[in-house]
Amino acid sequence: MSLADSVLAINNDLPIRTDSPVHSGKVRSVYWLTDADSRRLITTKGYNVPEDTPLAIMVISDRISAFDCIFHGEGGLKGIPGKGAALNAISNHWFKLFAENGLADSHILDIPHPFVWIVQKARPIKVEAICRQYITGSMWRAYSKGERVFCGITLPEGLEKDQKLPELLITPSTKGILTGIPGVPAQDDVNISRSDIEANYQAFGFEQLADIDLYEKLLKDGFKVISAALAKLDQVFVDTKFEFGYVTDKDGNSKLIYMDEVGTPDSSRIWDGAAYRDGKILENSKEGFRQFLLNHFPDPDVLLNKDRMPEREALARDNDLPLEAMMQVSRTYTGVAEKVTGAPIPLPANPKADIIKILREEYDLIV
């Protein structure tokens, strides 16, 4: 098996029994199970959900996206070795820690394979729940241009790049393109304020106004749990994005849960603590890959300017990135995962074959 064979780049072609189109995201693909298979698994596996809950198989890939494009490397390498397994392992660890700390549940019911989650269908909140402890990234870019109000929050004068903020800040943005909300442009990833959410809470998917307080509490509490755990590893939890949704419990009540992934190098910035104390930024997240791309291509504006999206897509499609750059990302992701979980990350030689075998023999889901 070659290195390229160990990478799961295409994850939307598995022969999983479904009666709905496969939903393919940038990194994960979702296979909605038939009603019969959902009910069978809920009964036979003892999942703690109502018997009519729709279930899905969520399969992560090793693809790497940045600036809304998928990149690939030399030698037919269509993704990052170990990336998918590392992301899932990190999220699994944090979700377990959340449960131990009495926080909300997640959408995950079962983990058949390092690349696979069995999840319950949730009603998503249409908010990217972003939490920041340091001023960097888009917040710093806005601040350095003189902006002092960010997502409805007034920032103090005199802040310096990459410094710790006086308090943990929630700076939400829209999830997807939302139309018909006063004062909110119909664009993806638009910064919004808490006031925007309060005035239009149902349009953002909140079932009641009080749940805005709950989502903010779960976001901050989750951030603090991860930050404290990473601090013990001398890693700095800089900022992160969570997602939330509603599910119905066995008593018929709605409850707010964590969705997607949490505290990963894809959804967060993580800095090396020793380097930060020396005045340097050593990224242990996808931000390092983004910075590599900005330095690698002669015209970085292509990656930053949304008006040049066709050029950006062609750039990603037509360029094989150096193998060493891809492997550096692999070392970053698997290194963070091994630090967080305290265990090596499994790198199956043929992940697709392994997934099919497990889902056939242990779940009877392969056609």
From Swiss-Prot:
It comes from the Bacteria. Pathway: Purine metabolism; IMP biosynthesis via de novo pathway; 5-amino-1-(5-phospho-D-ribosyl)imidazole-4-carboxamide from 5-amino-1-(5-phospho-D-ribosyl)imidazole-4-carboxylate: step 1/2. Belongs to the SAICAR synthetase family. It comes from Shewanella baltica (strain OS195). The keyword ATP-binding applies. HAMAP family: SAICAR_synth. Pfam families: SAICAR_synt (PF01259). Keywords: ATP-binding, Ligase, Nucleotide-binding, Purine biosynthesis. GO terms for biological process: 'de novo' IMP biosynthetic process. One of its GO terms (molecular function) is phosphoribosylaminoimidazolesuccinocarboxamide synthase activity. Its EC number is 6.3.2.6. It catalyses: 5-amino-1-(5-phospho-D-ribosyl)imidazole-4-carboxylate + L-aspartate + ATP = (2S)-2-[5-amino-1-(5-phospho-beta-D-ribosyl)imidazole-4-carboxamido]succinate + ADP + phosphate + 2 H(+). This is Phosphoribosylaminoimidazole-succinocarboxamide synthase.
